[in-house]
């Protein structure tokens, strides 16, 4: 059983390969439990590889000086992780048939499935958990709707409810605003801020600094599989640092702890 310890993730001197490419060379990072973090970087920075490391889908190269621990454990099962880390990936949307009912999309997460609940049995407690997760995301009114009739933003919030139905210790979001329009992105960022205020720990992976909610104070910048900067949002998200990260001149301004980035 995974231990109850102070760190969510401890990585030291990890080398992670994706095929023949060294995606994370000599990578070290600690994320504490109770801490919310944003991982920021351009395409190809190593964000998706880091995410797979965090969720146990990939392992680092075996070396004496390397260690990788989740919740203090070097060995774990994906089943254990699934109950302690809720993961939301944009591509999950395509796993559901258009006729799938929204509440069934959420319930099926409890069985590690994507809908198709006809032969599944759910207890009143299961249904209560699904209803609570949907209410928290503001999509309880959509419970009886077919997945194919929902907007992109509504589908994304259903996916987050799926992740939260397990009552995980941390929620991991990969590029949550992908394919969303401006209004849906705004609603989503407000939803994330509400989740953080309610005590949900969040690891947000994005390439948009403007999506980082005020409640997230630690930001880690990745480029070419290496950590370019790691620290307080107010210091890391500067015009100079982001211009270096994205290799274009950028100007950063702030509005009520939301970061705004424009061409310089």
Spell out what each predicted region is.
Residues 171-175:
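Catalytic Walker B motif of ABC-type/P-loop ATPase nucleotide-binding domains
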């Amino acid at each position: 059983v995974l231990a109850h310890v102070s760190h969510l993730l401890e990585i030291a001197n990890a080398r992670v390969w994706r095929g023949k490419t060294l995606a994370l060379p000599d990578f070290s990072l600690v994320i504490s439990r109770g801490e919310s973090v944003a991982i920021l970087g351009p395409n190809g920075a190593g964000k998706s590889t880091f995410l797979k490391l965090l969720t146990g889908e990939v392992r680092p190269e075996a070396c004496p000086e390397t260690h990788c621990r989740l919740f203090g454990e070097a060995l774990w099962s994906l089943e254990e992780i699934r109950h302690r880390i809720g993961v939301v990936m944009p591509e999950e949307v395509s796993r559901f048939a258009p006729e799938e009912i929204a509440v069934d999309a959420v319930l099926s997460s409890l069985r590690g499935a994507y809908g198709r609940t006809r032969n599944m049995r759910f207890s009143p407690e299961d249904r209560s958990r699904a209803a609570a997760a949907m209410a928290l995301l503001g999509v309880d009114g959509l419970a009886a709707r077919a997945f194919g009739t929902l907007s992109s933003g509504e589908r994304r919030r259903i996916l987050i409810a799926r992740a939260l139905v397990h009552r995980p210790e941390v929620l991991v979001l990969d590029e949550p605003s992908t394919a969303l329009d401006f209004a849906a992105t705004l609603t989503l960022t407000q939803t994330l801020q509400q989740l953080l205020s309610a005590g949900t720990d969040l690891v947000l992976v994005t390439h948009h600094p403007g999506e980082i909610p005020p409640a997230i104070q630690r930001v880690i910048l990745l480029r070419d599989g290496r950590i370019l900067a790691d620290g307080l949002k107010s210091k890391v998200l500067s015009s100079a640092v982001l211009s270096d990260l994205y290799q274009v001149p950028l100007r950063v301004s702030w509005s009520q702890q939301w970061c705004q980035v424009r061409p310089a």
